[in-house]
UniProtKB/Swiss-Prot annotation:
This is Replication factor C small subunit. Keywords: ATP-binding, DNA replication, Nucleotide-binding. Part of the RFC clamp loader complex which loads the PCNA sliding clamp onto DNA. InterPro entries: AAA+_ATPase, ATPase_AAA_core, CbxX/CfxQ, DNA_pol3_clamp-load_cplx_C, DNA_Rep/Repair_Clamp_Loader, P-loop_NTPase, Rep_factor-C_ssu_arc, Rep_factorC_C. Belongs to the activator 1 small subunits family. RfcS subfamily. The keyword Nucleotide-binding applies. The gene is rfcS. GO terms for cellular component: DNA replication factor C complex. Heteromultimer composed of small subunits (RfcS) and large subunits (RfcL). ATP binds at G51, P52, P53, G54, T55, G56, K57, T58. The keyword ATP-binding applies. GO terms for molecular function: ATP binding; ATP hydrolysis activity; DNA binding; DNA clamp loader activity. One of its GO terms (biological process) is DNA repair.
Length: 329
């Protein structure tokens, strides 16, 4: 098991450069400080780590266990992905069996780590609540959730809740630069900015994009957008500006080119349009941005409901061309 994990770590940079101790964690300073206090006291309550993907929740749990128990911490921790093993049978069998066995004298307690706990069924959560009460003497539970509101209140009330925020821009870019140096990858500053924008504070996604782009050679903005399957923002802005200038046919041709060259769906296009509307590179009054954002939302809803991509996006460009006439003096 450990050998296969090591192979994966060598292949995936997100695993290879995953922090192993609390001191190595990027950002989340306040949370790390509180977790270090638990290590110092060798005691802690049940924990609920909540926040968006890629913000370090699972990593923090592993680092906490490592700092508590040492290099062999995995023998004192049961890790389950609750989205795969979410039913009451798993809770009653695996978790109960692990929790009921006593720990060695030098180990204060064992840890049950439930990743994606917000995907557990209601019955499984009720069973978990009872186990948390029964085995507090030997076991601590760490629950990880993207949506903590899906965790039943009786469990939330038994946990210390830690809310992980998206990582700060400077921390993401600094980490990416460091990884690029370790892997001897050449990367443009503009590409770092693009990776950060695309990852939206998700460090795991940022590292995966970096690794994928690095496979093509020097990491540039173009290679970044190529590996994520999105159009370069510059080209999206060109399409918008053509439509607003009243060049409907040219805008339509640009749209067709983008969809063919990048394999974009209608939803992909409208999401990128929505992002670029608020770019400082597009000079239109805020009142028009509001109208376009509202229209983009309407078009996306129709696309998700199954409407034809080409017809809806052409209608969107036509509306932009109509709005553009009002912009002209």
């Amino acid at each position: 098991m450990s050998s296969s994990r090591e192979v994966i770590a060598e292949l995936l940079w997100a695993e290879k450069y995953r922090p192993k101790t609390l001191d190595e964690i990027v950002d989340q300073e306040e949370i790390v400080s509180r977790l270090k206090q638990f290590v110092k006291e060798r005691n802690m309550p049940h924990l609920l780590f909540a926040g968006p993907p890629g913000t370090g929740k699972t990593t923090a749990a592993h680092c906490l266990a490592h700092d508590l128990f040492g290099e062999n911490y995995r023998q004192y921790m049961l890790e389950l992905n609750a989205s795969d093993e979410r039913g009451i049978d798993v809770i009653r069998s695996k978790v109960k069996e692990f929790a009921r066995t006593r720990v060695a004298a030098n180990i204060p307690f064992k840890i049950v780590l439930l990743d994606e706990a917000d995907n557990m069924t209601a019955d499984a959560q009720q069973a978990l609540r009872r186990l948390m009460e029964m085995y507090t003497a030997t076991t601590r539970f760490i629950l990880i959730a993207n949506y903590p509101s899906k965790i039943i209140e009786p469990i939330q009330s038994r946990c210390a809740v830690f809310r992980f925020a998206p990582l700060k821009k400077e921390d993401v870019i600094s980490r990416l630069k460091w990884i690029a140096e370790q892997e001897k990858v050449e990367i443009d500053e503009e590409a770092l900015e693009a990776i950060h924008d695309l990852s939206e504070g998700d460090m795991r996604r940022a590292i995966n994009i970096l690794q994928a782009a690095a496979a093509l050679g020097k990491v540039t903005v173009d290679s970044v957008y190529k590996v994520v399957g999105l159009a370069h923002p510059r080209e999206i802005r060109q399409m918008i500006q053509l439509a607003l200038a009243g060049n409907f046919n040219d805008a339509r041709e640009k749209l067709r080119e983008l969809m063919i060259n990048y394999g974009l769906s209608g939803v992909d296009v409208i999401k990128q349009v929505h992002r670029e509307i608020f770019s400082t590179d597009i000079k239109i009054p805020d009142e028009f941005k509001i109208i376009i954002a509202d229209l983009a939302g309407e078009i996306q809803f129709r696309l998700v409901e199954g409407a034809d991509d080409e017809i809806q996006l052409n209608a969107f460009l036509a509306r932009l061309a109509f709005l553009g006439k009002k912009l002209k003096p």
